[in-house]
């Protein structure tokens, strides 16, 4: 995904007008754009293709929703040291992101693992109950996908993960610190990075 501010101006075909207006006030639009971090949601081939699909749907005027994961470190930042490329984590959410809207009212519990138990109901139907599972709370964030020169705005909904319980005090009191923060670590692991280096055996 590209940076939101310049993208909106270009798609509404007002970029040059905004740039000229700011220049009259002694403000450089490019300097403002540089303050916005790139959404580090991953930049692989499939991710880029999905972004192009979303932009095309908006430009063609088709109403659409896209879904993805709100990776905290989806890409890396690079710099040159002693003539060599050095990769660093890109914490693009460190200072917040202005083109996303948190929607906690649409959170869902997502369950992992466990087992399913069948229960016979009085009306003869069978009810299936999942037990012994781990779960996280999925929280959506809306990002606008603006069509080109047509006043159409679709939505990319990216999902973050939060623990159902941030801290298990009972486990902590028993000296089991790892168990106390297990839920927190599970949520964090799901959204921390897009994928690890594939040079190592999983």
PLM region spans:
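Single conserved hydrophobic/aromatic residue that forms the stacking wall/gate
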Residues: 1-9
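Catalytic cores of large soluble enzymes that bind and process phosphate-bearing ligands
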Residues: 8-10, 41-45, 150, 202
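Beta-propeller domains
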Residues: 10-14, 167
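Well-ordered mid-protein domain cores that form the structural environment of catalytic cofactors
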Residues: 14-55
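Short, well-ordered loop/turn elements at secondary-structure boundaries
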Residues: 36, 50-53, 58-63, 69, ...
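Extended, regular secondary-structure scaffolds
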Residues: 43, 59-142
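Hydrophobic/aromatic-lined pockets within catalytic cores
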Residues: 58-62, 72, 163-166, 202
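Active-site cores of enzymes that catalyze phosphoryl transfer or operate on phosphate-rich substrates
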Residues: 102-202
């Amino acid at each position: 995904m590209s940076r939101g501010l310049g993208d909106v101006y270009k798609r509404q075909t007002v970029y040059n007008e905004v740039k000229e207006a700011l220049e009259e006030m002694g403000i450089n639009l490019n300097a403002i754009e540089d303050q916005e971090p790139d959404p580090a949601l991953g930049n692989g081939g499939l991710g880029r293709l999905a972004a192009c699909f979303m932009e095309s749907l908006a430009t063609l005027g088709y109403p659409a929703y896209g879904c993805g994961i709100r990776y905290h470190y989806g890409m890396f930042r690079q710099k040159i040291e002693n003539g060599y490329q050095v990769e660093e984590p890109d914490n693009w959410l460190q200072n917040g992101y202005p083109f996303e809207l948190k929607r906690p009212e649409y959170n869902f519990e997502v369950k992992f693992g466990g087992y399913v138990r069948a229960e016979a109901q009085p009306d003869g139907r069978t009810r299936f109950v999942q037990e012994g599972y781990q779960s996280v709370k999925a929280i959506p964030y809306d990002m606008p996908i603006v069509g080109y020169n047509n006043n159409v705005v679709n939505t990319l909904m990216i999902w973050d993960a939060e623990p159902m319980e941030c801290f298990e005090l009972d486990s902590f009191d028993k000296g089991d610190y790892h168990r106390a923060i297990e839920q927190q670590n599970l949520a964090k692991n799901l959204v921390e990075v897009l994928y690890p280096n594939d040079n190592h055996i999983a």
